[in-house]
Curated annotation (Swiss-Prot):
Main function: Acyltransferase; part of the gene cluster 14 that mediates the biosynthesis of a ferrichrome A-like siderophore which may contribute to organismal virulence. The first step of siderophore biosynthesis is performed by the HMG-CoA synthase (HMGS) MYCGRDRAFT_54740 which catalyzes the generation of HMG-CoA and CoA using acetoacetyl-CoA and acetyl-CoA as substrates. The enoyl-CoA isomerase/hydratase MYCGRDRAFT_76805 then catalyzes the conversion of HMG-CoA to methylglutaconyl-CoA.
Active site per database record: E367
Residue ranges, compositional bias (Polar residues): 16-25
SMART domains: AlcB
Entry protein name: Acyltransferase MYCGRDRAFT_85486
GO biological process: siderophore biosynthetic process
Highest taxon listed in the record's lineage: Eukaryota
Cystine pairs: none
MF term (GO), any: N-acyltransferase activity
EC number: 2.3.-.-
Ranges for region Disordered: 16-47
Length: 414
């Protein structure tokens, strides 16, 4: 297995938007000092220090001579891949050791974003080990004995991390869950309690699960720093009463480029009426996304079962829409925020939001108009399946389906 390393620091902000983390190679001893054999890093040394707001919180120590198997058990021994085991050394024992551990693992995954599994060692009697295993953030290696004296080897899995395993509540990429917003109540539930509901509207006539309440307009619902772009991305439930939100939305919809795809050009009254219909519709939520606080575009996420699209793709399209499957739409409004990498970051984040807000969501679909320039971009930058062209009442579209397992395995979170 090829391990990526870097000789420079990597800095990012946490989902709270204020805390800054830096991971960088350990500093070499000053020329005037005589480094010891234990502290002098060689050219191949890949120990890394993790800083939170310029304070050292942990060090990842690696011994290239100690390797363990990272291929799953079904792989033949002669084909199995191995990687060096890293050891996390926390700078001090504090009540927030678990939080610092998660931050250090976050930094490690951004540093080695092309890996699927990272082996680490941790003392078996440590509360940190209990945190890692019980939350699913790490799993004991099935190839190493659990030695209670010498510690055990744990495997960090990329897909578990980005699904939110072990994430501190205050640092989740998902910033709002109304069903768990009452302090002291309901936070133990991993998902909104399932109960039947019914929708009859237009082309829709279906039973479906009752959906949780949406956060209040203006609420940040998702937040993540995008390393490749060097900016922080936020998804906010659009607030039509906020002049900044509304003027940006109206300007985008009235532009020639956006109108070609969305066909929603019109006076302010039309835009206000549309956003109000979105606000009161329990199956959909309108979002405005911002780069470093600057409005950049618009999106919609919704529950697919009770969406108008569902009845037109339920046959001969190669998909089954489940009770908790979702769908999304994306509109990049500002010209300066266009481009493949930014689109990939926004699209990945919107899909990430969908999968995080309900772990029972197994699929997120999209149906852009077939002739839009974003169609090949979607096919290129998202690990989703292009199913077929479908005829909807208002457009001829391309049906895309993104599966949960593939997203967390192949999604680009860097």
């Amino acid at each position: 297995m090829t391990t990526t390393t870097t000789t420079t620091a990597l800095t990012f902000t946490l989902p709270d938007g204020t805390s800054t983390v830096t991971i960088r190679p350990t500093q070499k001893a000053a020329p005037s000092e005589e480094p010891s054999q234990d502290t002098a890093p060689s050219k191949k040394d890949s120990n890394h220090e993790v800083y939170l707001n310029d304070h050292l919180i942990a060090t990842w120590v690696i011994d290239p001579s100690v390797k363990t198997r990272v291929s799953p058990a079904q792989v033949l021994d002669e084909r199995a891949e191995f990687d060096s085991v890293r050891h996390l050394v926390l700078s001090s024992r504090r009540s927030n050791d678990n939080g610092h551990t998660w931050i250090s693992i976050y930094a490690l995954w951004l540093l080695h974003h092309d890996l699927d599994v990272i082996p680490i060692s941790s003392p078996s009697n440590s509360a940190v080990t209990t945190y890692l295993i019980n939350t699913g953030l790490a799993a004991p290696s099935p190839f190493e004995p659990a030695d209670t004296d010498a510690g055990r080897t744990l495997l960090l899995a990329r897909e578990a991390f980005w699904q939110g395993a072990g994430t501190p509540d205050n640092l989740s990429w998902l910033r709002s869950r109304p069903e768990a917003s009452i302090p002291g109540f309901n936070s133990h539930l991993g998902a909104f309690a399932s109960q039947m509901s019914f929708t009859r509207r237009g082309n829709v006539c279906t039973t479906h699960p009752l959906r949780p309440q949406k956060p209040a307009p203006g609420t940040v619902v998702y937040s993540r720093y995008i390393v490749e772009v060097g900016q922080h991305l936020q998804l906010v439930h659009i607030d039509a009463s906020n002049p900044v939100h509304f003027s940006a939305y109206a300007r985008w919809q009235n532009s020639d480029r956006v109108n070609h795809g969305w066909r929603e050009r019109g006076p302010d009254e039309k835009h206000a009426a549309y956003l109000e219909s979105q606000r009161i519709d329990p199956h959909t939520m309108s979002l405005i996304f911002l780069w470093d606080g600057e409005p950049a575009g618009y999106s919609e996420v919704g529950w697919a079962k009770e969406d108008n699209t569902a009845c037109f793709v339920s046959s001969n399209c190669g998909i089954h829409i489940g009770e908790f499957d979702q769908l999304s739409h994306i509109l990049v409004g500002e010209e300066k925020f266009r481009g493949g990498k930014r689109y990939q970051a926004v699209a990945t984040s919107i899909k990430h939001l969908c999968f995080l807000r309900d772990p029972r969501t197994t699929q997120v679909i999209a149906e852009p108009r077939f002739d839009l320039p974003s169609v090949p971009i979607q096919a290129r930058f998202l690990p989703q399946e292009r199913k077929k062209r479908v005829q909807l009442p208002h457009k001829q579209a391309v049906l895309f389906a993104l599966q949960r397992e593939r997203f967390f395995q192949e999604g680009h979170f860097y």
